[in-house]
């Protein structure tokens, strides 16, 4: 079936007015045989005047052209030779969709082995940020020549890159010989280059651009998958090219080289352009070969461990179609070219679009047309029949605006075919169809990458830069314009800037090396800083041992006065036994908020605890005012609660959870040793808090209270859990502050008379280390946080593990890293200077496994910190290191406690339960798991269960009050 009379007439006489529509048939997608396809009207077809600037040989595109006389070729032949390569936007969008699917398959662990588009991870994780500096060598091997460059990068005053380079030949006998010959040649050229510049003794870092498909597991290793283009050196496929090059250099023995990074030329192009434009996240080569790379989210790359950040993916899109997915658009000429190539059946997409094959495709078409007497009056010369005689540079010359037809005549004459003017115009038409198809296909595949980037970012419109290189894109007079135009139509929701790589991919290899060097140096400094937070098992065992020693000091009468871990007797001698009964008030004071509770405890067959509570806040001026103001405020809130519950009247028993270090001389007397957690109220330290509360009640003269028990929140937590689980003999709080308590044998509690039974000891372990025994593991950041705290020099262990201080440690590390230029572009913002900005909840959110980096960035943005993807990763790392140390230290402390209980009882193995409360333990995604693991590792002879206190320490205070009432035999609530 031919093109039809309307088109033939138009070709003979030229089009009518610009903008007219001619009913021209259209090739449909998915059909195997162009000659047997259905035809549909087409809006505007290109005329024969194809060298006119601004022509657009493409379906669905209006074209304004001048009339020109066309040789009367038959409609059948024109259809067969030219029209089969014409692709509509509909087909191009279909190809875009196919390539998007191929990309997904290549990234998937399950589908990658059979995927034709390999989507190779490059281990390039960052584009240049402008702070790179140094002196580098770059090798660029992969095209028609081999380049060596010396690249000096200086960023002190302005981003400045100076380069000197030399080009070396890669003769056919070398690229088709053995691998050792090839790399000996590279090593020889490198030696020559260094000799001329007198830098043989320098051992400069080397970046190696190796423009072939390689599998990498790190940045300085590249295992060749397959040769492409004209290379076929034996013994290299399946081998690490870095090792081969190092071996060749070593064999020479006259210089040494440090190969830091191997990159694909496409990655090199992206990095070269990325130095000038940090929006550049795609690299594109359209030259001898073709390929593209782009920055992919690590969470989508199954073949690489980790899910944080991005990594450059080398698509190796030249192999698109090797699985048969492009058979419907490949022509007989594509198949013939493939059969005669060095690698039949491979790189099929590349063979349809790249400069290495374009001239050959045109030659095959011309041969067939000549054989059919459609060109050159049927003359076929030996030159025309010789592969490689018609090059892509010939195609470019023939398609130039003004001299195209004349160039065609000269080129065809060189081939001995004696062309007529009409032959030259026809050949120009063939060249245009072939090169236009190439531009369209590359636009479709690049469109798929842009769509993927847009989807990854979750933005309706993408703004990005594509770094581009390659002789076809640069030298062909019409290629880039056609390519851009098609791309705009295929992906209208992307704003793309094309940045031409002026200095090739060699500079890119140097930039990758510079970035790798910068990142390695940054990584070294970051690791050095964070290593002080990473505690070995041996260090944790030492912490456990030291705490055990401090516990013994606190329990003994003779050493208690100088002990930092005070081991305070709580006078709680029994856990609940289930017979407790009555209505009790509880007061829970331990932070900026406090609770008043009514707790109704019922015993019998069905034990129940019913609670009513109200939360009140304590303003900062009262926290740091006088003691009378603080306790008057508390009593005012109790009065409000009694009115609220309608129970003001009878004298009710009250348990007072007071979460600060107190020395108790009885259950209902607690003398405040020191304020913690930001409290500073005067005239309280050294006084009995129960008496201070009773005095405030008297001053109010509204109601009376029976203060039965003063309880630490940790003891309250233990009692709450012990009511549910009788094996609970330890209490732990890890929230704003941190503390632990446990049931100690009375014989070991020298501060209280009597040797029978047990008593709960409030350890007050927050002060562990106040005597300097933990200085070997305290970091400079711990010291800064301590120095600026309200109670400098005190509660040092607590300041390393509790929620009130972890955020401050993180903030100080971030300030240090920002000063060093590792974070936030080196800019210390006002929010970062603000103490207390990093609350525990932010640490918990940032470390959540479920959060993608975009969400981490959003959290940082809420805090006024504008972060890049890399910033977010580092912030998350810092949070993780600080919270892990906290969990491990907490675990080491708990291991000391459970071991003491086991030894007290002379058991080979102890089963015990810990009642736990506190926001850090409850809300942090990893804290509890790490702490449990640490306890298990450090106390293997103990099986420790952890029970979360659901009702807080207020319920515990009521239970202790109930136990106290029961033990004193009070008839009102017996």
Curated annotation (Swiss-Prot):
Similarity comment: family membership: Belongs to the hexokinase family.
Subcellular compartments: Mitochondrion outer membrane; Cytoplasm, Cytosol
Domain-level remarks: The N- and C-terminal halves of this hexokinase contain a hexokinase domain. The catalytic activity is associated with the C-terminus while regulatory function is associated with the N-terminus. Each domain can bind a single D-glucose and D-glucose 6-phosphate molecule.
GO term, biological process aspect, one: positive regulation of cytokine production involved in immune response
Example GO molecular function: glucokinase activity
Domain Hexokinase: from-to ranges: 72-514, 520-962
Outcome of swapping residue 68 to N: Disrupts targeting to membrane
Pfam families: Hexokinase_1, Hexokinase_2
Tissues showing expression: In rapidly growing tumor cells exhibiting high glucose catabolic rates, isoform HK1 is markedly elevated. Isoform HK1-SA, isoform HK1-SB and isoform HK1-SC are found only in spermatogenic cells. Isoform HK1-SC is detected in round spermatids, condensing spermatids and mature sperm where it is found in the head membranes, mitochondria of the midpiece and the fibrous sheath of the flagellum. Expressed within the principal piece and midpiece of sperm tail (at protein level).
Protein name from the UniProt record: Hexokinase-1
Chain sites annotated for binding ATP 1: 86, 140-145, 481-482
EC number annotated for this UniProt entry: 2.7.1.1
Regulation: Hexokinase is an allosteric enzyme inhibited by its product D-glucose 6-phosphate. Hexokinase activity is inhibited by N-acetyl-D-glucosamine.
Residues at which D-glucose 6-phosphate 2 binds: 588-592, 713, 736, 917-919, 953
Region feature Hexokinase large subdomain 1, mapped onto this chain: 264-503
Function: Catalyzes the phosphorylation of various hexoses, such as D-glucose, D-glucosamine, D-fructose, D-mannose and 2-deoxy-D-glucose, to hexose 6-phosphate (D-glucose 6-phosphate, D-glucosamine 6-phosphate, D-fructose 6-phosphate, D-mannose 6-phosphate and 2-deoxy-D-glucose 6-phosphate, respectively). Does not phosphorylate N-acetyl-D-glucosamine. Mediates the initial step of glycolysis by catalyzing phosphorylation of D-glucose to D-glucose 6-phosphate. Involved in innate immunity and inflammation by acting as a pattern recognition receptor for bacterial peptidoglycan.
Region described as Mitochondrial-binding peptide (MBP): 57-66
Residues noted as binding D-glucose 6-phosphate 1 in the record, renumbered to the chain: 140-147, 265, 288, 469-471, 505
InterPro entries from the UniProt entry: ATPase_NBD (IPR043129), Hexokinase (IPR001312), Hexokinase_BS (IPR019807), Hexokinase_C (IPR022673), Hexokinase_N (IPR022672)
PROSITE patterns recorded: HEXOKINASE_1, HEXOKINASE_2
Binding site for D-glucose 1: 211, 228-229, 264-265, 291, 316, 347-350
Annotated segments matching region Hexokinase small subdomain 1: 129-263
UniProt gene name: Hk1
């Amino acid at each position: 079936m031919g093109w039809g009379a309307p088109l033939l007439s138009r070709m003979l006489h030229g089009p009518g007015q610009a903008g007219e529509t001619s009913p021209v048939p259209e090739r449909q997608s998915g059909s195997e045989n162009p000659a047997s396809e259905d035809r549909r009207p087409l809006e505007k077809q290109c005329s024969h005047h194809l060298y006119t600037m601004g022509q657009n040989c493409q379906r669905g595109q209006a074209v304004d052209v001048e009339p020109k006389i066309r040789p009367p070729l038959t409609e059948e032949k024109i259809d067969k030779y030219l029209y089969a390569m014409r692709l509509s936007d509909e087909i191009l969008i279909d190809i875009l969709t196919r390539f998007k699917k191929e990309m997904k398959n290549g990234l998937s662990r399950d589908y990658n082995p059979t995927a034709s588009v390999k989507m190779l991870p490059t281990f390039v994780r960052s584009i240049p940020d402008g702070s790179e500096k140094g002196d580098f060598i770059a090798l660029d091997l992969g095209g028609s020549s081999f380049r060596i460059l010396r690249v000096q990068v200086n960023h002190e005053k302005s981003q400045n890159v100076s380069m000197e380079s030399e080009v070396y030949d890669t003769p056919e006998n070398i690229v088709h010989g053995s691998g050792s010959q090839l790399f000996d040649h590279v090593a020889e050229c490198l030696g020559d280059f260094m000799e001329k510049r007198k830098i043989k003794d320098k051992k400069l870092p080397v970046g190696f651009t190796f423009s072939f498909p390689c599998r990498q597991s790190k940045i300085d290793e590249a295992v060749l998958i397959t040769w492409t283009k004209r290379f076929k050196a034996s013994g290299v496929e399946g081998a690490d090219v870095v090792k081969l090059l190092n071996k060749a250099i070593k064999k020479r023995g006259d210089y040494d080289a440090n190969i830091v990074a191997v990159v694909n030329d496409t990655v090199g192009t992206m990095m070269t352009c990325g130095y000038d434009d940090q929006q550049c996240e795609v690299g594109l080569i359209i030259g001898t070969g073709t390929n593209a790379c782009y920055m992919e989210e690590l969470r989508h790359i199954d073949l690489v461990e980790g899910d944080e950040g991005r990594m450059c993916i080398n698509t190796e899109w030249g192999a698109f179609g090797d699985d048969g997915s492009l058979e419907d658009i490949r022509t007989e000429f594509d198949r013939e070219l493939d059969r005669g190539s060095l690698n039949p059946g491979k790189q099929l997409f590349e063979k349809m679009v790249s400069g290495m094959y374009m001239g050959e495709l045109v030659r095959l078409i011309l041969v067939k047309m000549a054989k059919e007497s459609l060109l050159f009056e049927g003359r076929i010369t030996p030159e025309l029949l010789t592969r490689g005689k018609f090059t892509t540079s010939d195609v470019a010359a023939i398609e130039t605006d003004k001299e195209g037809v004349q160039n065609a005549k000269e080129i065809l004459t060189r081939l001995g075919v004696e062309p007529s003017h009409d032959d030259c115009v026809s050949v120009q038409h063939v060249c245009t169809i072939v090169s236009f198809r190439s531009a369209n296909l590359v636009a479709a595949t690049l469109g798929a990458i842009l769509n993927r980037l847009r989807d990854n970012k979750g933005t309706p419109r993408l703004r990005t830069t594509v770094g581009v290189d390659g002789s076809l894109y640069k030298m062909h007079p019409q290629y880039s314009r056609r390519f851009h135009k098609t791309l705009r139509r295929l992906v209208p929701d992307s704003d793309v800037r094309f940045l031409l790589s002026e200095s090739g991919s060699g500079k890119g290899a140097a930039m990758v090396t510079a970035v790798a060097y910068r990142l390695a140096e940054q990584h070294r400094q970051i690791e050095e800083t964070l290593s002080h937070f990473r505690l070995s098992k041996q260090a944790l065992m030492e912490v456990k041992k030291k705490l055990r020693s401090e516990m013994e000091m606190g329990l003994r009468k003779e050493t208690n006065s100088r002990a930092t871990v005070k081991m305070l007797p709580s006078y709680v001698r029994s856990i609940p036994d289930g017979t407790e009964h009555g209505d009790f008030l509880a007061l829970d004071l331990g932070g900026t908020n406090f609770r008043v509770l009514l707790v109704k405890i019922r015993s019998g067959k069905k034990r129940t605890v019913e609670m009513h509570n109200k939360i009140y806040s304590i303003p900062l001026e009262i926290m740091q005012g006088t003691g009378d103001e603080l306790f008057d405020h508390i009593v005012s809130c109790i009065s409000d609660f009694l009115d609220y519950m309608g129970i003001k009247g009878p004298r009710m028993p009250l348990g007072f959870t007071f979460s600060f270090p107190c020395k108790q001389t009885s259950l209902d007397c607690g003398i405040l040793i020191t304020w913690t957690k930001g409290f500073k109220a005067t005239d309280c330290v050294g006084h009995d808090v129960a008496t201070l509360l009773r005095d405030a009640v008297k001053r109010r003269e509204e109601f009376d209270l029976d203060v039965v028990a003063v309880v630490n929140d940790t003891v309250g937590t233990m009692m709450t859990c012990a009511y549910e689980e009788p094996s609970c003999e330890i209490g732990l709080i890890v929230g704003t502050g941190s503390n632990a308590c446990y049931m100690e044998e009375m014989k070991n509690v020298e501060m209280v008379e009597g040797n029978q039974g047990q008593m709960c000891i409030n350890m007050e372990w927050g002060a562990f280390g106040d005597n300097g025994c933990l200085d070997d593991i305290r970091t400079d950041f711990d010291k800064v946080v301590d120095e600026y705290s309200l109670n400098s020099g005190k509660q040092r262990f607590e300041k390393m593990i509790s929620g009130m201080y972890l955020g401050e440690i993180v903030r100080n590390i971030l300030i240090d890293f920002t000063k060093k230029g590792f974070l936030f572009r080196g800019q210390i913002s006002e929010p970062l200077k603000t103490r207390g900005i990093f609350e525990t909840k932010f640490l918990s959110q940032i470390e959540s496994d479920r959060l993608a980096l975009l969400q981490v960035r959003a959290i940082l943005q809420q805090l006024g910190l504008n972060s890049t993807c890399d910033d977010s990763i580092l912030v998350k790392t810092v949070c993780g290191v600080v919270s892990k140390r906290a969990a491990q230290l907490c675990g080491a402390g708990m291991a000391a406690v459970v071991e003491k209980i086991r030894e007290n009882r002379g058991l080979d193995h102890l089963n015990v339960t810990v009642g736990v409360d506190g926001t850090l333990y409850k809300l942090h995604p990893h804290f509890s798991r790490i702490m449990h693991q640490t306890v298990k590792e450090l106390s293997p002879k103990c099986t420790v269960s952890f029970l979360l206190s659901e009702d807080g320490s207020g319920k515990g205070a009521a239970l202790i009050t109930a136990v106290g009432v029961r033990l004193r035999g009070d008839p009102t609530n017996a």
